């Protein structure tokens, strides 16, 4: 009888191990670099920082031969395909601009919203033209909106399309105003941390300086 109890105990212990769930990451960062081919990761390997791409290549997981069949290869379609896992006929983004109801429209243009942080036309943007959910949207749904999803980029489409419909905040750069903005699709006013960043006027500072390469110019190919 003792042997039977011992056997049951051991089996239960193994069951507990088998059902143990891996610890979920607290932060997921998605980075898309325009026009950076996959082979550049290795071509310029010696120039990466130890805690950046080198760490990802050394400790991360590489998904190779992953192809999404679409054309043309433009920014808006690329972001939409990567972050939705679908193609233009499914996610609805057919270009940086495309014909909708007989008119050429910006892929993220939306006249039903208002700019926040600017008075210019750069703020009339939202993800309404995107027909499906993104990774960020699914993360929000899976956690009952407890997850925080934020999109930031210089281009509006590069910030809006990856973040999706249910992001907590999406910010892009208005090159006319010289600051980061958003639209009423997401919020009615900019967070204080965005206002503080804008007040630093870094764009003006950088434009007044001479552009220098990180390494000697003759070492670039």
Label every PLM stretch briefly.
Residues 26-37, 56, 82, 139:
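Beta-strand elements within well-structured catalytic alpha/beta cores of enzymes
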Residues 23-25, 74:
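A generic fold-level signal
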């Amino acid at each position: 009888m003792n042997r039977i109890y011992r056997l049951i105990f051991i089996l239960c212990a193994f069951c507990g191990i088998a059902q143990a769930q891996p610890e979920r990451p607290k932060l997921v960062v998605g980075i898309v670099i325009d026009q950076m081919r996959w082979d550049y990761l290795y071509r310029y390997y010696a120039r990466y920082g130890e805690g950046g791409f080198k760490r990802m290549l050394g400790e991360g997981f590489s998904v190779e031969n992953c192809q999404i069949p679409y054309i043309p290869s433009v920014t808006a379609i690329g972001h939409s395909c990567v972050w939705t896992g679908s193609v233009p006929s499914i996610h609805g983004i057919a270009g940086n601009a495309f014909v909708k109801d007989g008119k050429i429209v910006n892929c993220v243009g939306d006249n039903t919203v208002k700019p926040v942080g600017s008075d210019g036309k750069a703020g009339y943007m939202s993800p309404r033209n995107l027909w499906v959910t993104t990774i960020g949207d699914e993360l929000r749904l899976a956690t009952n909106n407890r997850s925080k999803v934020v999109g930031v980029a210089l281009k509006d489409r590069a910030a809006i399309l990856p973040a999706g419909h249910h992001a907590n905040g999406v910010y892009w750069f208005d090159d006319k105003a010289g600051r980061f903005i958003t639209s009423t699709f997401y919020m009615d006013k900019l967070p204080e941390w965005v206002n503080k960043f804008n007040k630093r006027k870094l764009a003006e500072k950088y434009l007044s300086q001479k552009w220098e390469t990180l390494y000697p110019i003759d070492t670039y190919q």
